[in-house]
Amino acid sequence: MMILSIIATVVLLGALFYHRVSLFLSSLILLAWTAALGVAGLWSIWLLVPLAIILVPFNLTPMRKSMISAPVFRGFRKVMPPMSRTEKEAIDAGTTWWEGDLFQGKPDWKKLHNYPQPQLTAEEQAFLDGPVEEACRMANDFQITHELADLPPELWAYLKEHRFFAMIIKKEYGGLEFSAYAQSRVLQKLSGVSGILAITVGVPNSLGPGELLQHYGTEEQKNHYLPRLARGQEIPCFALTSPEAGSDAGAIPDTGVVCMGEWQGQQVLGMRLTWNKRYITLAPIATVLGLAFKLSDPDRLLGGEEELGITCALIPTSTPGVEIGRRHFPLNVPFQNGPTRGNDIFVPIDYIIGGPKMAGQGWRMLVECLSVGRGITLPSNSTGGVKSVALATGAYAHIRRQFKISIGKMEGIEEPLARIAGNAYVMDAAASLITYGIMLGEKPAVLSAIVKYHCTHRGQQSIIDAMDITGGKGIMLGESNFLARAYQGAPIAITVEGANILTRSMMIFGQGAIRCHPYVLEEMAAAQNNDVNAFDKLLFKHIGHVGSNTVRSFWLGLTRGLTSHTPTGDATKRYYQHLNRLSANLALLSDVSMAVLGGSLKRRERISARLGDVLSQLYLASAVLKRYDDEGRHEADLPLVHWGVQDALYRAEQAMDDLLQNFPNRVVAGLLTAMIFPTGRHYLAPSDKLDHAVAKILQVPNATRSRIGRGQYLTPAEHNPVGLLEEALRDVIAADPIHQRICKELGKNLPFTRLDELARNALAKGLIDKDEAAILAKAEESRLRSINVDDFEPEALATKPVKLPEKVRKVEAA
């Protein structure tokens, strides 16, 4: 009985931690339990004395502070990693949303499913059905990329006329004031037609002058610029990246010095600016330049510090000395992008966005707005492109035949085709879910990094898979090629607005560990403010948090999550339970990693990256489950749900295993392994059988396939190869039973080629009627159009001689 009572006590202690019972109530329960065991004669009643001696200091605040919290507080202040101003502003910026629940070890699934699903307004739907549809029809991507290296003038005019560049601008200034969800839908539709078109529309509606002016501009700046931006009268760009400072924006060498100077014949307070920027989208044609630079005030003319820090200003590009107009040439996807320079240019101090009072506030302004732009534009562009590619590749896999069968029936093709379908579903779920949060008023900085990284990364992998499937059809450029420019341009999305290597290894967990953790940010604030009282309360909540996640990790690992709460009892039930377990694992690993590695965790980028991977996969899986629920839990969609969640579970567990295999403290790694994997690893990647089911969805018209491609431009127009492939798929499927019947009548397995010739012969023999012959003839026309590639006169591929600059510039840092 003594052994059983000890086991029961351990179980009780674990239950108190598991259910996160308060310290005071837990102490009372333990005292009552010990007393009961004493009365029962199992334990000595005198055990209450040492137990009380242990518990009393924890529950009496003055004693607890002096004996425990104060020494820990002093140690914490010593080991707390140093934080630059830009890092602090990045962490303080934005808000925490659903990712905070995932990080805390106990997700509230009811809360997730109660988030309202966005709906398009009548105005937004009309814009998608009208101007967006027409812009897609007008876009000839091969002409844009190969012949013009730009959008045609009539398309530029159409975009300005219908205020495509004003989706984020409020109606009071003449903008459209669309929701984040509507912006995402617009960009997805455009990107399925032309990457250049989507980038051109997306950038002014992302981080740039319009967004910054609405949040921080003076009334005079808003009233002057916003109506002009809304009408397309002004074309904006924003210049942040320098040759010497790409991802490390805090190190920009571009400078501004506050001084008096002459402006329009008068002496005014202003700034002398010097900058050298590159990779600036829309810079070659911009009329107003948003500029980030480091501002100093050596004579203290503004009355504050000498070194004010990063500042943002708006400068008309007509200002004398502004160098603009030259273009970069990004990977044969020549959207308007180029360098801008200025040397010792004087402008009035009022050019600062928000006026002089916002001097030195530029980095905070940028990071507060970046989460919205980065969470919408890049994920939407990548997602829209992959959705269209998924439909087109699935159609091509059905139409294209080798060895007398559709290549889509070959297992070697099914594997990458399933990845394309699964990624399209997951990416759309992830890109949509973040818009829910933005529409609720959140600025989810960590989520925007997750969605940017994983949508662009999965987008690139999916396009590579599509190229493997289509072969020569994807390689040969021309008007009928739906894939090659997306393939060439995929690294662009990977690189911009936080290169993906940096985003994964530093930003996701680097911000998430502090921003999403329930206590660390407040503990750091308490340490900085020398507030031991606040630290005391947080410390013991934090200890309880770690204890809870330790117990939850072990128990849920032992039971494979079977005892944890789930909001549903259907085919997705086990997924919620697995995610409960992984959430507890992540919370435990995060706390232990921060405790053991301290400030060095910042430099242990591969550990940080793997912790970020776990958080990311938890988000992607929960986005899939949310999408499945929002769309009505269609059973036909389950193969995609299974694929998306199983892939996420496998990747998350793999990341944890890799982390533990490489954790520098091997003793701690062993203890963590025992807690997290008490019975070993459990999750497998999607099976061959599941891949078969998912790949099949893309190859025949069905409701699930339509949901994968929801909102894309699928009209079979002259310059829309995706729409033409969709039409060809329908034509070929209509012809297939007729072809099979002819084969049966003739007793031959005829190839699915020369269907027009076959139709004439079968009609002459009375095997089919005229309508069926017409179906076969149309299918042959569509089939040939789908599998053929473009060819050109030799001179059509030559380019004009490139005029080299007279002076060779010094090689800039890579």
Curated annotation (Swiss-Prot):
Q: Which GO terms describe its biological process?
A: fatty acid beta-oxidation using acyl-CoA dehydrogenase
An example of a GO molecular function for this protein is: long-chain fatty acyl-CoA dehydrogenase activity
Q: Say what happens when this gene is deleted.
A: Cells lacking this gene show undetectable in vivo beta-oxidation levels, and are unable to grow on oleate or decanoate as a sole carbon and energy source, in contrast to the wild-type parent strain.
Catalytic residues as annotated in Swiss-Prot or TrEMBL: E497 (proton acceptor)
Provide the alphabetized UniProt keywords.
FAD, Fatty acid metabolism, Flavoprotein, Lipid metabolism, Oxidoreductase
Query: Which reaction equation describes what this protein catalyses?
Result: a medium-chain 2,3-saturated fatty acyl-CoA + oxidized [electron-transfer flavoprotein] + H(+) = a medium-chain (2E)-enoyl-CoA + reduced [electron-transfer flavoprotein]; a long-chain 2,3-saturated fatty acyl-CoA + oxidized [electron-transfer flavoprotein] + H(+) = a long-chain (2E)-enoyl-CoA + reduced [electron-transfer flavoprotein]
What the record says about the induction of its expression is: Is under the negative control of the global regulator FadR and the positive control of the cAMP:cAMP receptor protein (cAMP:CRP) as well as the alarmone ppGpp. Is induced under carbon-source starvation and in the presence of the long-chain fatty acid oleate. Induction during carbon starvation is cAMP:CRP-dependent and sigma(S)-independent.
Q: What is its EC number?
A: 1.3.8.7, 1.3.8.8
Pathway assignment reads: Lipid metabolism; fatty acid beta-oxidation
- Pfam family of the protein (one): Acyl-CoA_dh_1
The cofactors required by this protein are:
FAD
Tell me which InterPro entries the record gives. Answer: Acyl-CoA_dehydrogenase, Acyl-CoA_Oxase/DH_mid-dom, Acyl-CoA_Oxase/DH_mid-dom_sf, AcylCo_DH-like_C, AcylCo_DH/oxidase_C, AcylCoA_DH/ox_N, AcylCoA_DH/ox_N_sf, AcylCoA_DH/oxidase_NM_dom_sf
Q: Name one GO cellular component term.
A: cytoplasm
Q: What class of enzyme is it?
A: oxidoreductase
Q: List the disulfide bonds.
A: none
NCBIfam families per UniProt? FadE_coli, PRK09463.1, PRK13026.1
Protein family (similarity comment): Belongs to the acyl-CoA dehydrogenase family.
What job does the chain carry out? Catalyzes the dehydrogenation of acyl-coenzymes A (acyl-CoAs) to 2-enoyl-CoAs, the first step of the beta-oxidation cycle of fatty acid degradation. Is required for S.typhimurium to utilize medium- and long-chain fatty acids as sole carbon sources for growth. Is needed for bacterial survival during carbone-source starvation.
Q: What is this protein called?
A: Acyl-coenzyme A dehydrogenase
